[in-house]
Amino acid sequence: EVLANMNRRDTKENMRELFAYIKKEIPDAILRTTVIVGYPGETRKQFLELRDFIKEIKFDRLGCFMYSKEEDTVAYSLPNQVTKKAKENRYNEIMALQSDISYNQGLSHVGEIHKVIIEELDFETNLYVGRSYAFAPDDIDGYIFVDSKEDLELGSIVSCQIDKADIYNLYGHVVNV
């Protein structure tokens, strides 16, 4: 219902089928999305449907935003504006849920070997910072921090065994394969 109010053509059922198809055809596919909470007219029940959908799909990466009124948009003058406090609570609930999902997704990679492109050296930790195919260069995805006994060239691609994870990042060491 909220999607329809936002003039989105997709339905929850269509998206569920699409994500299932993607995961069936490409098991290592990374599912990422952004969601908005507090759109005018969004009820607690509708919010809980969104939360349950996120729990079900288990997105690898998720960004959440609170609706904010912008002049010259259809939503600006819609009735039943959601209170700031309700939007903040919903945002926090989604982000807490996604933190748990992301942490568990990260833990599932421990022991795996990933190809990582090296972007920089973090001088504070003396770890290289990079990304694999699963990490987009934006504000939603994290990094892979790579320990190496040898100096690595920026832009090089190395094999990295994942040793641990936190909510957004993976940590590992260079291996020769």
Identify what each model region corresponds to:
Residues 1-61, 67-86:
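Conserved non-cysteine loop/helix-boundary elements of the Radical SAM core domain that shape
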Residues 77-177:
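Terminal RNA-binding accessory module
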